[in-house]
Amino acid sequence: MSGRVGDLSPKQEEALAKFRENVQDVLPALPNPDDYFLLRWLRARSFDLQKSEAMLRKHVEFRKQKDIDKIISWQPPEVIQQYLSGGRCGYDLDGCPVWYDIIGPLDAKGLLFSASKQDLLRTKMRDCELLLQECTQQTAKLGKKIETITMIYDCEGLGLKHLWKPAVEAYGEFLTMFEENYPETLKRLFVVKAPKLFPVAYNLIKPFLSEDTRKKIMVLGANWKEVLLKHISPDQLPVEYGGTMTDPDGNPKCKSKINYGGDIPKQYYVRDQVKQQYEHSVQISRGSSHQVEYEILFPGCVLRWQFMSEGSDVGFGIFLKTKMGERQRAGEMTEVLPNQRYNSHMVPEDGTLTCSEPGIYVLRFDNTYSFIHAKKVSFTVEVLLPDKAAEEKLNQQGAVTPK
């Protein structure tokens, strides 16, 4: 039995009745605590009454703390309204709202430099509530229960800039919030135009997703437009995505409904860095350098780094060793990222590199040009691995290579 209204086993019926009884004290604080609503929490915790109750009570506290009942009337800051990509557009064949996330033009760093993380998260909470409100309106309009949404992730242009650690962490917070407070609202999620970097990006966010959510993700290949049309009527799908829907002015991207983001002008910036915690600190003597080695076992892995220096600039470059088991000078190794000096004492530096071949990669902090000052450098380096299942699927389908 699916655990949905009209498809409950006797044991599930009993669990639903008991659950309603156990949480009756908090039901008045919830917008529409019908059987459909309660069953979402039960399904999310496999009908474990104790876990379902704990989850729902935590959600009630969340609604109170974040003032969720009034969040729809809240207006996000201008920079978020203008540049946070995505939007609701059309309905699938069952009448469920369709939400688009447009990844490529999203300027994640610009958003975190221009708005608070709390305002960004609050905007996503507001989006969730607006989608649930739309589900309620669709239920009344169609005369059948609509309680889930279809999502389309447009990954064209997904690049290394999207792997910036603070952005991934902020997105992880949103996913955690979504999983904990809007369970069983995702019907399915289509990933379209996924580049070769997608398996690495997916592996970063996968820990924040429940097993049930992961099963609802479909990574589509070159025939993605045909697949979408099996789930969404052409008149409900923008021309950009294979349908016939346009804006009133004929725009095929339906920009009146879907925000396509873009680079944020620096006049919106309220900060030029995001506070970081670093895993390592090292004192580099004058006229010296410090090398950190990372073994890359297969192509497609991504090196991600952040560093800052104190008092003055520092050189940084990445090299590939040509001899194993011994320290090599920079001139003896293959240069991968040219060495240059960074003002990381003023603004912390960060970056990513897709490793095209296996081997020992050396990240080299350079102070050889300084004959007077030692430098303290704090840094974090990670090796990001691709999700193998997603990678295999993309290889089978012939993934789009990012430009």
UniProtKB/Swiss-Prot annotation:
It is found in: Cytoplasm; Nucleus. Residues 76-249 form the CRAL-TRIO domain. Keywords: Activator, Cytoplasm, Lipid-binding, Nucleus, Transcription, Transcription regulation, Transport. One of its GO terms (biological process) is positive regulation of cholesterol biosynthetic process. Pfam families: CRAL_TRIO, CRAL_TRIO_N. Carrier protein. Binds to some hydrophobic molecules and promotes their transfer between the different cellular sites. Binds with high affinity to alpha-tocopherol. Also binds with a weaker affinity to other tocopherols and to tocotrienols. May have a transcriptional activatory activity via its association with alpha-tocopherol. Probably recognizes and binds some squalene structure, suggesting that it may regulate cholesterol biosynthesis by increasing the transfer of squalene to a metabolic active pool in the cell. This is SEC14-like protein 2. The gene is Sec14l2.
